[in-house]
Amino acid sequence: TVLISLQESWAIKEDHVIIQAEFYLNPEESAEFMFDFDGDEIFHVDMQKKETVWRLPEFGHFASFEAQGALANMAVMKANLDIMIKRSNNTPNTNVPPEVTLLPNKPVELGEPNTLICFIDKFSPPVISVTWLRNGIPVTDGVSQTVFLPRDDHLFRKFHYLPFLPTTEDVYDCKVEHWGLNEPLLKHW
């Protein structure tokens, strides 16, 4: 069960939008709190380390955010979710399966370092498992990812990255698992 809180102003039409997105997921007891400007992450709060993580370190030189505020919001979200679950008679949320695209960061040249991008889009709830495979074997070295990024339609998107050295022998896969999928989805490159 997921409780999502997206706060943005719809009162007037503006050229730019800042979104404060937060969610709490039960029974996994995972949470996310982030700020977004025109679709790009400004920062998120690492709930384990209890600290603000700026998407670009330079952002932290011009602004500040106390992670404790997000942690307090999560405690309220958890309490609200528990109440809503009881009131809804434990009716589950609808699982919306993701759309997945796999592409290189730049034009591929054999032997030249590059990055594969697994773009996972239009899914809910914000729970996903991604595994990178090279020739069918899991790869973890150098792998990175974004937090869950909110969309205007209240679905989510997320990016996963794998640095690689292109060869003619290697085959790469981005394996995505989500509650809305009957089986894992593999995208090949």
Q: Residues of each region from the PLM?
A:
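Terminal anchoring/processing modules of extracellular glycoproteins
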Residues: T1-W189
